[in-house]
Structures are given as C-alpha cells and as structure tokens.
Amino acid sequence: MTQYTPMIQQYLKVKADYQDAFLFFRLGDFYEMFFEDAVKAAHELEITLTSRDGGSSERIPMCGVPYHAAKNYIEQLVEKGYKVAVCEQVEDPKTAKGVVRREVVQLITPGTMMEGRTIDEKENNFLAALTHFEDGSYALACNDLTTGQNTVTLLTGSVEDILLEVYATGSKEIVVDSSFSKDELNKLTETLKMTISYEDATAIPEGLEHLVKNVSQAKLIKAVGRLFNYVIRTQKRSLDHLQPVEIYYTNQFMKIDVHSKRNLELTETLRTKEKTGSLLWLLDKTKTAMGGRMLKQWMERPLIQKERIEERLEMVETFVNDYFLREDLKEKLKEVYDLERLAGKVAFGNVNARDLLQLRRSLLQVPAILEAISLLDNAYAARLIQGADPCESLTELLGRSIQENPPLSIKDGDIIKDGYNDKLDQYRYVSKNGKTWIAELEKRERDITGIKSLKIGYNRIFGYYIEVTKANLGALPEGRYERKQTLANAERFITDELKEKETLILEAEEKIVQLEYDLFTALREEVKVFIPKLQHLAKVISELDVLQSFATVSEEEQFVKPVLTTKREIFIKDGRHPVVEKVLNGKLYVPNDCIMPEKMDVFLITGPNMSGKSTYMRQLALVTVMSQIGCFVPATEAVLPVFDQIFTRIGAADDLISGQSTFMVEMLEAKNAIANASERSLILFDEIGRGTSTYDGMALAQAIIEHIHDQIGAKTLFSTHYHELTVLEDSLDQLKNVHVSAIEENGKVVFLHKIQDGAADKSYGIHVAQLAELPDSLIARAKEVLAQLEGQEEIIIPKRVEVKAQEQEQEVIPEPIVVKEEPVEIEETKVDNEEESQLSFFGAEHSSKKQDKPVLDAKETAVLSQIKKIDLLDMTPLEAMNELYRLQKKLKKG
C-alpha cells in the first residue's frame, strides 16, 4: 500500500472496515469512490467513470457525486439493497497538518434508512436480528429506526416458520452472527430478498439497558443485544427515541403462511406486487401515516383472542353509529403529522424548523381528540387514552419560538420568532435599522450629487458600496468618495461612514444567523424530553385512526358486524369478496352464502372453469381475516368462529393471481396444512392433484379429503374438477357437495356465480375455450375427442376403509373396485388403430383390442337414451338400484 499517495492510503485504510459497502469518501465538495467501488457505482448510478493518479504505476478508477446531491445517489444504492458508508472530513482543511482527518459518520443500509423515497410513509422500515440457539430455537428482534419501535419473540418451529415470521415483519435487512448457517441464509435471501449483515456482539450496549427492563429471558436479550449493537455501530449518533422492547408470541395471533398471504393478496397483489387491488388497499381509509402503518401490522397478525377482537368490533360499531363523531375525528386526524417519525428525527438531530412546526400543528389537534374519546361509554376507549399527555407545554413552547414560514435549512436564519430571545431581538434591531440607514444614505447622496442612478449595493466580496455609472462620474464632487472597484460601465466607491455601518450590520446579521442556530439546537434538546410522551400519543392516535378507517369502509361498503362464536360453525349470509366487489365498481356482484354447521367440515366444490370457485374460497378467508382484525365483514349476516390458522393452496384462476406452481410446490403446501392444521383452522384447497396424471391426482385428492375429514376436522373448502370425488358425500358424513351453477343458452355457457347444493354436472371446459376465442377447428376437434372419451369411461370407486385408532400410524391403501364400461356406439364411425391409441387414456386393453360393434334394436336404443339422461349424482344408491332394476325389466320384456 506504500506505493499509493497518503490520501489513497487513508481511503484504503477506511475501506478495509467497510468491505460490504460503498465508501462515499469526502473530498472537498464531492464524495469520491475508488477502485471496485467506482466501477460498480458508475454502473449502478449511471455516472461517468474516470481515473486518477494514486501514486502507483496504474491509474485508479474513480467516480464521484456532488455532496449536495449525495442523498439522491445514496437512496438509489440502498434501494437496490446496497450499503453506503459516509466518510466525512472531521477537521478544517485550512488548519490540518498533512492529510485531512476523515471518519465514517454513518453506515446507511436498507434496514437503517431514516428518510427518502425508499421509505413508504405507511410502512415500517424494520431491521431484523436473528439468533439461532443449540436447542433449535430462534430469537427474532426487530427495530424500526424511523419510529424507534422494538419487538422481540422466540420461535421454535421449522425454518419455514422462521421465514413466515420474518416475512410478516416486512424487514429489508437481517442481522445474524458470522457463524450462521449458509443454507439458512440462502433461504432468507432467495425467499425474502433480504440484505444480510453480521454482528457477533450480543450484550446490551451501555446506556440502553432501560429498554429491556421487561425482558428476562436470556435468549431474547441476546437477540436484542445483537440488534442494538448493529444499530449503534452503523449509526454513530443519538438513539434517544428507541422505545422499550415489546415481547410478543406468535401463538397470540392467527398464523397465515407466506404462500397463503400472497395467494389471498392481503397487502399486495401477486401480479403487480402493489398495494392497489389488495385487501389493505380496500381497508385503508386512515388519515395519518402512523395509522396506515398500524393497519398493516394488524393485517399481518390477526388476533385469536375473542375478547380482544370484540373490543375492536364494539369500537368500530361506535364510530359506525355516530357519524358526527367519526367525521369530526377524521377532520382532526388530517392535521396530524407523523409523530413517530418526527420524534425519530428529533432524536437523530436532523429535524428542521418545518418539522417542529408540523409537530405543533399536530399537537393542537390532540386535546379535542382525547376529549371526544373520553366522553364515550366504552371501557376499551377509556383504557386506550389512559395516560395520554397532550403535551400542551410543548405546544406553547413551539408556538412562541418557531416562525410560521421557516426556511428548510436551519443555517439560513429567520427561524426564531421575535420576542423569544432578547439578544436576538437586539441584533435584529441593529440589522433592521442599519438597512434603513443605508436606504436613507442612498437618497441623500442622490440629492447631493444630482445623480438619480446612483445606488448603494452589497456583495459578499466587497461588502457595501456606492455605484456610479461612468457617464455620471463628472458630476461627483472631488474627493467625496474613495474608489473601491472599476467595472466596464461603472465605478464603485466607499466612504468611512458607510464602512462603519457595514461593520455594524454584517456583525449583527452573522450573529443573528449563529444565535438562531444555537437557539434552535437548544430548542431541539428541549423537545427530546417529550419523545416518550409523543410516542405514546402516536400509538393512541394510530389505533383510533385504524378503528375509524374500519368504520368508514364498513359504512361505505355496507359491511356488517360479525358475531363471534365459540362453536365450530360458519354462518355467512350473502357474503361477498370485498376487493372483487370494489373493482367491479357498481356492476352487479353475486353474493353467496357459506353455511357450515358444527358437524359440517368439508365443502367439496365443483363447477365450470372460471365460474368463481376460487373467488368464493378466497372470499371466506378474507371475511375471516377482516373479522379477526376487528373490522366489519362483507355480508348481510355473519356468525364466525375464531380460527387459529389459515392454509391455502390456490392456483392461477379467476384472474386474481398469476403464475402456475409446480406439482411439488402443490404437495409441499398441502403437506404444510396437513401437518399443522387443527380443528380450529381454515383450509382452502383449489384443484389439488391437477399437476399430475388424472388417476394419481384423483387418488391424492381423495386421500387428502379423507385425512382432513377424519383426522383434522378443520373447516375446509376443497374445489375439484374430479367429479368422481362427489360420491364421497355418501361415505363422509361431514362432507357436503356444493357447486357453482351455470346454464347453457343457444350453445353458450352463462356463469351464474351462485353456490348451490349438490355436485356440478359438467365442467364446461370447451365452452371456456370458446370464450377464450380458440380456433373453431380446434374447438370442433375437442368436442369429437370428448365424445369418444365419454364413451370409454372407467369409474374407480375406492372402498371406504375404517381405520382404528391404534392403526392410524400405519399406511392403509384402499382397495379399489374397478367397473369397466364397454363402449357403446350408436353410429358407425371409423377410427383407425393409430387414432384409437392416441385417444385412449385408460390402459392397454382398451387401446390394443378392437371392440366388436354391437347392433342395437329400437327398444335398446330407447333404454340407452334414458340411461344417458339419468343424473346419478343426484340419486341415492337405493334409487339408482331401483332405476337399474326398472330398466333391466323393460329390456327383458318380449
């Protein structure tokens, strides 16, 4: 390294401690990057890559950005998942001996960004720290540096469970120790697209012990310690806004796995990854940024405690029933800025005068909000606002100190009001009167010299001066002015009197700017004392904002308050999919009931493609989630249990999500539900088994249905195209067939989108293909193939095998009874061997042997016609036997 110049040596020494970050190295008015950083940054930021002599034989790659524009470039890099170390000059270059001393003052990472376009005002920006213990458990600690919020929990499940919880936090960066499993890190980066950082220190840093007073478990303290040490190491500044650590347990909330959250589109759509079109988009009527963040947190973790849910529902009902209270609250909330993040900026020392003005305007609304809520006859409301301090003394302090329209920079002056500080008032008097004297001097000199164009001006280099154009120089009295500067068309002069006043004015203005800055920083320290009270207020206001948001959307969309029951029953009358209904924007939406009594666990749903089966299934899940976050639901009546978990396996359908999963993913998701669901869970399986061959898929689907029915007992909606499975209703007493209805008119299918009892008679797949405008020739061919396949159908009816309790762990394979129906041909149709082989999917004996074509008389043809019209799925076994006996008797008659 000795071959490099001293400055490059300094750069390399600093860079050695920040190998995983871009080093923004301050050189005068620029931040420069060198070597590999320069090459990569030039590409990512689309800026010019150049080079410079660094003392070695080869020139060093270099790029740079102006310091005043650095914020934008840093945001671009962090948005892409990179880290940026900001290295500043920490001594005055004019007084430095040798190379100017430089230090990294902040490491900016995806999880520690405080502001910028990467920070959504209605989303937290969590940094997570994960600690793995020898017994297989994990501790997960999270911090949002923008709000000061800290949480920690202990996790004991599989890696998938860990991923679920990390996903729920929405963290963009995760901190682990240097020995963390590489395989697990790969899962984190591949599944959740997170930035990985390392920190081995786990002791709680000095000065932050008070934040973990309520945390006694050693595992949790280690995770929090890792988190805090990383934050201190990267931020290198005051963390006074950090809030006491909140412990939570995952079993306090409804569990929804990562895939289910995506399938249900709770907070973002699968196709665009945007909020618009999600359930969050529909429910978000919050008026404050912090309310929006709390809403998202509630949606990520629905409650499972019946009493807590009912508290929220009662509060929402209060707002629904009191229009004037709700509207008045909304108007006041509009004027409340982001108290949490304002408190964070105060602690970090980057708050400006406009921020404090926003804080004051927010606090002005608080007394009226608290008073209105205190008048409610509601225990939850009283408990919510208990201990909330309106901070009236802070409001008064800010009111008499900060100007109404302050500049953005705190170094430009004009921040502090007149009357706040006596010395400042004196300086302002001198400055103001001095400028008045300048104006009077200009008028007097014009009168004395008779030069109307004479003017007194000012610039930073020469100070105040008297300017006379060259055309008027002859009118000046000899020796009146002292020449200062010559211009092309004018001369500039000064006088002793002007210089004296200049000194007074400039000293006053400099002192004004400096004193205002000092007063502002002192004021900022006074505001710091109020941070805990402001954070408590923020939580109260956020919760009220979410509850009014629920009330507003419930009123607008005609939702109903759900009744929670301890029984395992679902009663939803005229239920709707809330997002689909909203997107239809006034067009007719067909509501559907979902009535599952205590002893009814499985709905087996059949029906045409694109008829709305998947929408119906999602509808139930969304109604459940809405109920358990405390919101009214889209129905005319709803009685619901409290579910502990939701599992979904929903593929591409109904234009709600995109992409198609592999069969392996399908089976893994099914396994997850089967392994973890309880009788208090909700399972939604859409077309399980479609990713493999017909028989394999049907067998797996039946086995899964039977297992859920017999062993789990979870409320389940199971849609299928395997109409053969509808016979399970006869052997599974807690399973019911339902279908989505459709009718044919003039050869076209009309989807009624209505759920009805019983099984569907057909799938209308070819009709859907017609709707998709496939070629007519292809449609015609499909109809030919369908007709021939229907003529050589093979029905598999597995025997129902009762499994004793002590035998449940053994694998039991039902013995199938195979009933082969020989094809019956009415018309003479020639099909060569090759075509027959292609069309037969049901074994070699059908494709290798030519069947003798029977000759039917008129009576046999009539009976065959009657058989075709019989709907066996609507008949009991006894009715089917009687019908078969009647037809057989008819054929035997002479």
Swiss-Prot record:
Residues reported in the UniProt entry to bind ATP: 607-614
UniProt entry keywords in alphabetical sequence: ATP-binding, DNA damage, DNA repair, DNA-binding, Nucleotide-binding
Biological processes annotated in GO: mismatch repair
One of the record's GO cellular component terms: cytosol
The keyword Nucleotide-binding is annotated on this UniProt entry: yes
A family per Pfam: MutS_II
PROSITE patterns registered for this protein in UniProt: DNA_MISMATCH_REPAIR_2
GO molecular function terms noted in the UniProt entry: ATP binding; ATP-dependent DNA damage sensor activity; damaged DNA binding; mismatched DNA binding
Cited InterPro entries: DNA_mismatch_repair_MutS (IPR005748), DNA_mismatch_repair_MutS-lik_N (IPR007695), DNA_mismatch_repair_MutS/MSH (IPR017261), DNA_mismatch_repair_MutS_C (IPR000432), DNA_mismatch_repair_MutS_clamp (IPR007861), DNA_mismatch_repair_MutS_core (IPR007696), DNA_mismatch_repair_MutS_N (IPR016151), DNA_mismatch_repair_MutS_sf (IPR036187)
Keyword Secreted: no
Signal peptide: none
Task of the protein: This protein is involved in the repair of mismatches in DNA. It is possible that it carries out the mismatch recognition step. This protein has a weak ATPase activity.
Family per record: Belongs to the DNA mismatch repair MutS family.
Protein name: DNA mismatch repair protein MutS
